[in-house]
Amino acid sequence: LHFIIQGGYTLKYLDKKLIVKIDEEMSKKEVLEYMINLVCENTDLIENKAEFSEKIFAREELGTTGIGRAVAVPHARCEDVKDIVFSVALLKNPISDYLTPDSENPKIVILVGAPKSKNSEDMKYLSNISRWFKNKENRDNIMLSKDRDELIVELLNIGE
């Protein structure tokens, strides 16, 4: 799956199997564990699930990755990640224990894993994801997705 984010960067690392819609109410920890499992079970890009999980949660300890506007971008770089990987979750219920600068609990979570060797590329993608989700219309279109297929269609519309 390839799609374009504003600014012309292709997110060549996102796979349809890594896009989910979650209807159950979940805590921040549950969502992150779910997404980590999703990436590890559906790709061969994570060589050590325990280390990747530890890095994701350690990053959260440094400060929230909730960027506001109902969006969170948990991310980590570690040696056991072979290439950049993205997973997207749309939640029916906001994550009530996920801190954000504007107190708007996340309903969209983009999990990003990257190898230590791709630091600048990783930062470029994180910056573009953040910029893209500042657009209210983009966020609304994602949040209005009724199911996984609609969510995929909306993600494919990024940058058009």
Where are the predicted features?
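Cytosolic covalent-transfer regions centered on His/Cys nucleophiles
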Residues: 1-160
